[in-house]
Amino acid sequence: MSIRFMLNETSYFGRGAREELAGELKKRNFKKVFLVSDKALVSAGVAAKVEEVLNKIGIPYDLYDEIKPNPTIKNVTDGVEACKASGADVIVTVGGGSSMDTAKAISIVMTNPDRADIKSLNGLSNTKNRAMPVIALPTTAGTASEVTINYVITDEDAEVKMVCVDPNDIPILAIVDSELMASMPKGLAAATGMDALTHAVEGYITAAHNEMSDMFHMKAIKLIFKNLAAAVNEKEPYAVEQIGLAQYIAGMGFSNVGLGIVHSMAHQLGAVYDTPHGIANAMLLPTVMRFNGENPETAQRFREILCEIGRPDAAHLNDQDVINTFVWMISELSKAVGITTTIKDYGAKEEDFEMLAEKAMNDPCKPGNPREVTKEQFVELYRKAM
């Protein structure tokens, strides 16, 4: 049986890597840039670091920054119109998952005008044409949208996060520059770091995992447990760089094998209560891992992880002790970076659980979970996460 892996054409990684953008734009003979970011990054001067690179080589660009933290259909449709008006031939996106996901959605519609109804992109999109070229420079260390075939857009009317999966949307270039991540506020660094951990853990235990994805996910897990607290609490440059690497290689893995029900549940919290995605994952991860660990094969995967992150004694523990230890280590890391909230703190109400569970049942991440889950079990998992 063959293994298919889809990645960027080219990737750059390291402090100051954004300078590579100039050479790539010249080499590919692009004439004008449509720059996609968000207002916070523009105000903080982060987007300006990339604008400096563009100005050095004299390439014209138009800036689009009308993007919400949970980007909406309107953010995309307005962006498409702005991109058309600009006459650009390449999109450069600077930001976290919000900016990158919006840029990817815009790029798909630009070359697939028959899919201008953004709702038609939900799930497996099956678009006909390769997206308009996108070069992605992440400013957060979590979503890995710069290397994935996924993007998430919120349908505000239906209160649903649309997980759009399309091999045509992967950016041609990913430039992971930890200097662009250094300005992240502590809370955002913690949230995106726990998002990256969720990607790596869910990717490692997902039903479709393989030897290649295992390699990426295990390395990401080790890097995150070792470096996240220092990256968040001390902004230690090497730790920030290592978390940037961890989130990227986790994305290399999960984009090709899928995720699980932590994401199925987190998407609904974001759509209904506007809960930040990384925080939602952090709050749900321990509860869901305890549930998934009841599958003996998954408990063994937890055992393998523990042996690699400083608990070699896990090789001799029974499954229940393995589950308890792994869940405890996740919870302790979350506390260490300042995430101590529950879904109740973000507005979750028990009377909403049936509705949330129904939506989670239809989420595209659900099929990847290593254990089957019913609507009733989703309700109970939300209840336990309170």
Q: Can you name each region flagged by the protein language model?
A:
Residues 18-21, 43-46, 73-76, 98-103, ...:
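Short glycine/serine/threonine-rich phosphate/pyrophosphate-binding segments
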Residues 42-115, 229-240:
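N-terminal small/polar loop signature for handling phosphorylated ligands or for N-terminal nucleophile
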Residues 1-64, 385:
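An N-terminal, well-structured beta->alpha segment
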Residues 74-179:
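Glycine/threonine-rich beta-strand-loop-alpha-helix active-site module
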Residues 150-257:
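Carboxylate- and glycine-rich phosphate/diphosphate-binding segment that chelates Mg2+/Mn2+
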Residues 272-352:
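Gly/Pro-rich interdomain helix-loop hinge
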Residues 349-386:
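Short, amphipathic C-terminal "tail helix"
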